[in-house]
Amino acid sequence: MKPVIALVGRPNVGKSTLFNRLTRSRDALVADLPGLTRDRHYGEGRVGGERPYLVVDTGGFEPVAKDGILFEMARQTRQAVEESDVIVFIVDGRNGLAPQDKSIADYLRKTGRPIFLVVNKAEGMKYTNVAADFYELGLGDPRAISAAHGDGVTEMINEALDVAYAGQPEESDEEKAQHGIKIAIVGRPNVGKSTLVNTLIGEDRVIAFDMPGTTRDSIYVDFERQGKKYTLIDTAGLRKRGKVFEAIEKFSVVKTLQSISDANVVILLLDARQDISEQDAHIAGFVVEQGRALVVGVNKWDGLDPHVRERTKSDLQRKLKFLEFAKFHFISAAEKTGIGPLMRSVDDAYKAAMSKLPTPKLTRALIEAVEFQQPRRRGPVRPKLRYAHQGGQNPPIIVIHGNALDAVTDTYKRYLENRFRETFALTGTPLRIEFRSSTNPYADKD
């Protein structure tokens, strides 16, 4: 599971600036939780090498607030701290130590989480001057950074990740071998995730084992269906009680994002009786960003008026158009209808995601696509697409070589993607296409 780094501090110390720096984007949000003024924002960490992690940006923290907006912001921050593996406590190097900093430090110490004290806005200042005040907090050596300019940020986050990953358990090869296709069932609260879980697991409720982490346990439930092995990743809050699993419908953004990253195939469950929300689209967007195979289940389809069904289908096509690669199934988890086709699509999506695409076949498909429709010229140059090979699996990556490929339009790229999908039956998985141009300065102009 990806570790979680929580950014905590009083208002205006630079938490959002650091969040944007770590996610390398001002719009890298993958999920928002509704609140009063400032919500918890979750993003994919992109600074710190190859180690994946999630970043949580919290509102300004007033730990002693008793009511109103400040109380709500404090509640949001406490929830983020509870979900985190490491806390980055940010203070303001320009304004110095504030009484609120002391209150926050007192609270954070009681959590038992690893804490990195970070002095922001330290650009152009001597470390000894910046750090002096903050030793009083008793949280070890302060780390001086400038979130706005990036100074010290990479070193700081790498140290935090060292600590976070030290607490992450590694699955043994034997444990990995026990698993079938890893499935994450994700969606908003009350869309029927726990009902679908119980329908899939049936009466057996077979092996469950915990992999202890630093702050949370991840539960995997192995089950068989029609002779095939699957492993359900706990997203609905499964907990064993006696010989039975109790499904607790408690939505956790962190749990959802971690489960998506860990899965082979994601089932995005929607409620046919509710409009598609921003939260649904955010979750779907994260699935695509992570390159995970996807099947969409539209639940509670039974008993719906035909006009409502048509309106729902139209709404899905309009709001989730970017999921055209995925199969949509209209099901009732409670009535156990549509579950068989849903699971067959899970199998197909996994097979597509893990496809091995031979270079000769890829190149032949590329040549046929170009012969049917050539890319447009850009000025005097027409892109020349020469050959293709596979660059990875889960999701499949197709690397195309040629000349002047930076002139290939997004429209033509989508055309190629659709041709490859059709040729190699790549339904249910995102598909990445990468272009690598020749550096030959004497490449032919068409």
Swiss-Prot record:
Alphabetized UniProt keyword annotations: GTP-binding, Nucleotide-binding, Repeat, Ribosome biogenesis
Record has GTP-binding as a keyword: yes
Domain KH-like, chain residue ranges per copy: 355-439
Transmembrane region(s): none
UniProt binding sites for GTP 2: 187-194, 234-238, 299-302
Residues annotated for GTP 1 binding in this entry: 9-16, 57-61, 120-123
One Gene Ontology molecular-function label: ribosome binding
Family: Belongs to the TRAFAC class TrmE-Era-EngA-EngB-Septin-like GTPase superfamily. EngA (Der) GTPase family.
Protein name: GTPase Der
Organism: Paraburkholderia phymatum (strain DSM 17167 / CIP 108236 / LMG 21445 / STM815)
